């Protein structure tokens, strides 16, 4: 099974931190082999065409931006 790459895009705001914590919790609950990284570089964020943060990127694909999903919703996005 391949390692899941999770990126949290955002400047480090409270919602960004919440999304990071929830995404990590969801990945752990699912038993995924994963790497998670916070990305604050605006050039990288804009490269994903994300205009509102926080955003969740899984294996290079933007799954959600501009809101913080629940852990249950994140589990669906990660599985």
Each language-model region and where it sits:
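Local sequence-structure signature of Cys/Sec-based thiol-disulfide redox active-site neighborhoods
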Residues: 1-25
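Short helix-loop-beta junction
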Residues: 25-33
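Thiol-based oxidoreductase modules, predominantly thioredoxin-like and allied folds used
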Residues: 32-42
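Short acidic active-site motifs
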Residues: 41-44, 73
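Structural micro-motif
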Residues: 49-56
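Non-catalytic, surface beta->alpha helical segment in thiol-disulfide oxidoreductase systems
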Residues: 61-79
């Amino acid at each position: 099974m391949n390692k899941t790459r999770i990126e949290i895009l955002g400047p480090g705001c409270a919602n960004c931190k919440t999304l990071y914590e929830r995404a990590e919790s969801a990945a752990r609950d699912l038993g995924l082999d994963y790497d998670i990284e916070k990305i604050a570089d605006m050039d990288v964020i804009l490269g994903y065409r994300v205009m509102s943060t926080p955003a969740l990127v899984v294996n290079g694909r933007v799954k959600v931006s501009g809101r913080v999903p629940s852990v249950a919703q994140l589990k669906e996005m990660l599985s």
